[in-house]
Amino acid sequence: KRLFKYKIHSFRRSLRLMRKNILKKKFKEGTPIINGWLQIPNSFSAEVMAQQGWDSLTIDMQHGVIDYPNALQMLQAISTTETVPLARVNWNEPGQIMKILDAGCYGIICPMVSNRKEAEKFVQACLYPPKGYRSFGPIRGLIYGGQDYGSHANDEILKLAMIETSEALKNLDEIMSTPNLDGIYIGPADLSLAIGQKPGFDNPKGSKTHTEILNILKHAKKHKLFAGIHNASPEYAQEMINLGFNFVTVGSDQRHMSSEAKSVIEKMKGSKKGQDIKGY
């Protein structure tokens, strides 16, 4: 058996078959995906996070302090593990989407998708023709993904559109019926602002934001899409899983570091001596 497995492994290596996106496998199996969030522009901190066992890690290029050279090194660090590398781009801009995919990113979270046209623009930027208009040049994607990357990338790349604007709430079915869209991702802070509420995470039951979250989830389930959401705490993330979300982000590298440092200071100097946790 060992010899057979070795031969199969050697055969796959010789062919360089494209690395599978295990997030899609988990979705089909009904297994919740626990996603980490990176805002610090450092490959070592990304490697430390990746070693903790997250199913995926998202490099935040929208609100994190991360540019492309940072992101490339962080992708290299994440690839030392089985954690799936994702990125949230700073806007629905094809050039940036294609470039970070070329660097070996296995999925894109796109902010502020408000209608069908914007959803199609986003999805098609992630796909090679004839399904999309992505330009071919996966300079690191070939190294990380495999030599047959071009033949299978359309099937493996994860595409999540963020639902967080008042216009998007009016166009949920149009957005979610976009061909080849894999799922949606809720940004609770911007969603709260869009409906006249204070921005924040872990919105309580009965709040306007929580009601809208349930409505978005219902539509995602109807269209059989990934349903993702950003959370501040593991307890709230578990509540979201119990409701039916299958992709949950819990905090961020910056927030985890702040929280642990605050805890240490409070224990050493007395309660409430640490700074309130900032960021998300």
Give the label of every model feature segment.
Residues K1-L17:
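Short, Lys/Arg-enriched N-terminal segments with co-localized hydrophobic residues
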Residues L15-Y280:
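Expand to "…catalyze enediolate/carbanion chemistry for C-C bond making/breaking, isomerization
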